[in-house]
Amino acid sequence: MSDSVELFTDGACKGNPGPGGWGALLVCKGVEKELWGGEANTTNNRMELTGAIRGLEELKRPCEVTLVTDSQYVMKGITEWMVNWKKRGWKTAAKEPVKNADLWQLLDEQVSRHTVKWQWVRGHIGHPGNERADQLANRGVDEVRGIRHG
């Protein structure tokens, strides 16, 4: 039987594009693991995707994952848009290249290793897991900007 894992992810950007960070909080059997990082010049959508990718990459064996995001972009991309992007060779309905296709392809690869249930929550309304992921993403931004945390 595979482990059940909750994964809360978020991305943040100071300027868009600008310095950005991603955060992921993994919860399995009451044990929590925090992950975060950042990039000097990126977008909020790239950081949202990276949070989900890095969280899933951290799982060393197939798991049943409930992935919680406050990003409509990630949620709709993975659950609605991706199937058609793939059919069209990573092009949009307007025949334009899919933005962030490199990250969407990495996310698709990671999702294929697990059973993932996607859950969207409204951001910044006090959802504990989402708030923690937001704090981690902002830590990633701060580290890129040279701001240290205790």
Swiss-Prot record:
Domain annotation RNase H type-1: ranges: 1-142
Reactions that this protein is recorded to catalyse: Endonucleolytic cleavage to 5'-phosphomonoester
Residues that coordinate or bind Mg(2+) 1: 10, 48, 70
Cofactor annotation: Mg(2+)
Localization in the cell: Cytoplasm
Function: Endonuclease that specifically degrades the RNA of RNA-DNA hybrids.
Subunit structure, as described in the record: Monomer.
Name of the featured protein: Ribonuclease H
Natural source organism: Pseudomonas syringae pv. syringae (strain B728a)
